[in-house]
Amino acid sequence: MNAFLVDGVRTPVGNFGGTLASIRTDDLAALTISELLKRNSGLDPALVGDVILGCANQAGEDNRNVARMASLLAGLPVSVPGETVNRLCASGLASAVNGSRMLALGDADVVIAGGVENMTRGPWVMSKASKAFGRDSSLYDTSFGWRFINPKLEAVYGVDGMGVTAENLVDKYSISRDDQDAFSFRSHMKATAARDAGRLAQEIVQVNIPRRKQDDLIFEHDEFIKPDTTVEILSKLRPAFRKEGGSVTAGNSSGLNDGSAALLLANESGLSSSGLTPLAQIISSAVVGVEPRIMGIGPVRASEIALKRAGITFDDLDVIELNEAFSAQALACIRAWGLDDDDSRINPNGGGISIGHPLGVTGSRILLAAARQLERTGGKYGLVTLCIGVGQGYAVVIKNTQ
């Protein structure tokens, strides 16, 4: 059997400390699951074979299997199980692939996949001392980056921060600051145009934020987009990760963001029994490992393998959703594929630099974005791909079924 993406919905992406900061991570995930079920009211919730959510943190309110907790909070029957997937930046894509495999095997006919991350609410964590009454405890902010580093791993592979890995790609592939800022500017302009034209709204469910002694705040647009930015403004920002000779800045990097997404997946049996119409077919996938110090190059080989498994080439693609962790990382991948920096197929409605990058959500967001873009344009094939911290790459090929 085959696996199909039927529908999907996401929250607007919130800034770090922004509009979604007051919402628990499990509640945020439940919100999009609940909306997905409302939008597909002909589906009996008891027929959902599994709820699979990506989440990269899992140290706070997203602990102890947030997918299961969100499923219950969304009102799904207790008989519907849940699983949380952690492949860092690609968690939301891995959840969809895991669900697709269940559908292909016939282990389920309908699956809800997706992802959640409230990076604002990532807690501090403290290690226990190595011995009773010891004083060698460590304290970490879990919102982003390494924690509890293994010295053996550090000795062999290093533990470069994500921004430093982007600087490593700048060095390796001779990517200029001007090109990075130009890429970032284009991302914001594309996202602004997509928002203003209502294309992003097709993916989004509004979030009502309770306020004391006031009406609820209605949150319905991604708040990380910067419509008024310019190349000149971006060029004035200081390097954020390498003070001397660096070129990766806050302006040409993705953000720390909050959000959730839910996707409805089904095989032919699930489509037929529930009267569902597929949006896209999941054709192939690939995941690879690369050197952790240049983790951003992971999409290159993963995409090449996924395309080969699908029996197509880059020339056959109508949309390419490449997560923009950093301008440098995206440009390194684009150039390695032999494509132009401004190829119109790449992130036509903006990407991680402009929309934001809530870690566990982005894979699901860009899978849905690619499917909706194919639906709008009548294109046939889409590629969805992300780099992953600690050196991996993930890619999925989809086919328009509309």
Tell me the role of every PLM-derived stretch.
Residues 110-168:
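Flexible glycine-/small-residue-enriched beta->alpha junction loops
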Residues 85-117, 170-199, 262-269, 334-335, ...:
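Active-site-proximal alpha-helical scaffold in enzymes
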Residues 21-111, 115-134, 204-220, 293, ...:
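Conserved beta-ketoacyl condensing-enzyme motif
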Residues 1-23, 144, 230-297, 301, ...:
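Condensing-enzyme catalytic core mediating Claisen C-C bond formation in acyl metabolism
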Residues 23, 55-110, 143-145, 156-162, ...:
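Conserved catalytic cysteine-centered active-site region
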Residues 165-167, 203, 211, 283-354:
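Active-site pocket-lining segment
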Residues 25-40, 66-70, 95-98, 162-169, ...:
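Short, well-ordered amphipathic alpha-helical segments that serve as non-catalytic structural scaffolds
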Residues 10, 22, 26-31, 42, ...:
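N-terminal extracellular/periplasmic Venus flytrap/periplasmic-binding protein-like
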